[in-house]
Every structure is written in structure tokens, then in C-alpha cells.
Amino acid sequence: MSNIIKQLEQEQMKQDVPSFRPGDTVEVKVWVVEGSKKRLQAFEGVVIAIRNRGLHSAFTVRKISNGEGVERVFQTHSPVVDSIAVKRRGAVRKAKLYYLRERTGKSARIKERLN
């Protein structure tokens, strides 16, 4: 029974997901429904956490909008997520960057990874 579930989950997983890590700046394009209209909305920010669970994988993106911190959790293989583009690679040494929540301005910057 477990093999059947794994096989079904494997079929539903997206194959075109780029590799990114915490600290990377990504742009996620999401389908938004407003009334009868359907359009793409971009959300660009720093990946602060990744949760790898196969089909149920998710990642958290944080950005500053109008001086207010905004975090959004995206399901990696969701049909609502249209595309993920890596804009900048960040050099960090932690898997979860929750410490960025308390930081603002220059102290919240992340160095760029060269390789």
C-alpha cells in the first residue's frame, strides 16, 4: 500500500523546481483569483526556511514591504505556485534564518555566495 502512495505522490511532484537554499533571494510567481479574474502575482524575498517532505515540501519567504516584514509559506509542488526563480545566492551557515525577524536595515543583509 505504501508503494502505491509513494508512486502517486511522485507523479504529482513538479520536476522543474530549481535548487535553492536558505539565504537565497527568490521570486515566486503565484496564481491569484480575484472575482472571476485569474492573474499571476510575484512575491520576492529571502528564503528563511525549507521543509523537505516530498510532495508536502514547503519553504518560507520573507520580505520587507512598506517597512513591515511579510512572511509567506509556499508549498513547493502546489499548482498555485507557477514558477520559482532564484535571483541571488546567499551565503549563510544555518538552515533556519528566523533570527532575521528581529533584524532590520544593514544587520539583516546576507552576503552573496560566490560559487
Curated annotation (Swiss-Prot):
Which PROSITE patterns does the UniProt record give?
RIBOSOMAL_L19
Q: Which Pfam families match?
A: Ribosomal_L19
From the Swiss-Prot or TrEMBL record, what is one GO molecular function term?
structural constituent of ribosome
Record GO cellular component, one term: cytosolic large ribosomal subunit
Q: Name any Gene Ontology BP term.
A: translation
Give the record's keywords alphabetically. Ribonucleoprotein, Ribosomal protein
* SUPFAM superfamilies per record: Translation proteins SH3-like domain (SSF50104)
Entry similarity comment: Belongs to the bacterial ribosomal protein bL19 family.
Stated role: This protein is located at the 30S-50S ribosomal subunit interface and may play a role in the structure and function of the aminoacyl-tRNA binding site.
The name under which this protein is listed is Large ribosomal subunit protein bL19
